[in-house]
Amino acid sequence: MAKTKMTKQEKSWVLYDVGNSAFVLLSSALIPVYFKSIAEPGSSVVVAWGYAETVASLILALLMPILGSMADYKGNKKKFFMATVIIGVICCALLGFPSQALPFLILYVVAAVMLNGSMVFYDAFLVDAAESDDRLDMVSSHGYAWGYIGSCLPFIASLVIVLFGSNFGIDMSTGMKIAFLITAVWWFAFSLPLVRNVHQVNYKEDDGTG
């Protein structure tokens, strides 16, 4: 009978999906609405938002294959993972402060690129976290499921603050600042178990010729 209980390393890997999914959900539900509220009157909000998404995708397409290849070498995977998480979290936390569309879009693009970049290294860590190859699918499915469930908690808290904050003297701008901070803290906190408990055991040795 196959072992179904997850190890500390496997649980730590799963938890990062709980953390980053909070930003994914916020990006799809609240961020476009908030962006429309700070965009200049008469501007094409849909076009601007579409450009931002396109730019983020292009940057990711250009950078991630290179970084992914570099991360295969000993000691690099966690460094790149931590760098993308930290930059992404900082940009997420700052999203509530710009009052104009362009600074907001710049922060959003960087946060989105870093989120997706961290996912490249996160997925690469699966082979290091799983106890054996035959557990890869099981651990991955737990990550997907718990990511979906866990992302709802900070999102619901953020939604309540944004929608009902006026009852407590909190306007939408302040509510969104709080929502971005909640999401950033959640994202960062759930990255820590992976950083602490999952180590790169599958890697290429640097032969010094690069």
How would you label these PLM feature ranges?
Residues M1-S12, A93-S99, P103-L105, G117-G210:
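Intracellular loop-helix junctions on the cytosolic face of multi-pass helical membrane proteins
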Residues A2-S57, A101:
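Helix-loop boundary and gating motifs at the non-cytosolic
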Residues Y16, F81-C91, L107, M114, ...:
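Residue-level signature of the transmembrane alpha-helical cores
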Residues V18, Y51-L58, I86, S141-I149:
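Transmembrane alpha-helical cores of Major Facilitator Superfamily
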Residues F23, V85, V110-Y122:
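Core transmembrane helices of Major Facilitator Superfamily
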Residues Y34-A39, Y73-K74, F125-D133:
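Helix-to-coil boundary motifs at intracellular loop junctions of multi-pass secondary transporters
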Residues V46-A71, I90, C152-F155:
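Central cavity-lining transmembrane alpha-helices of secondary-active solute carriers
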Residues A61, F81-L102:
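C-terminal ends and interior cores of transmembrane alpha-helices
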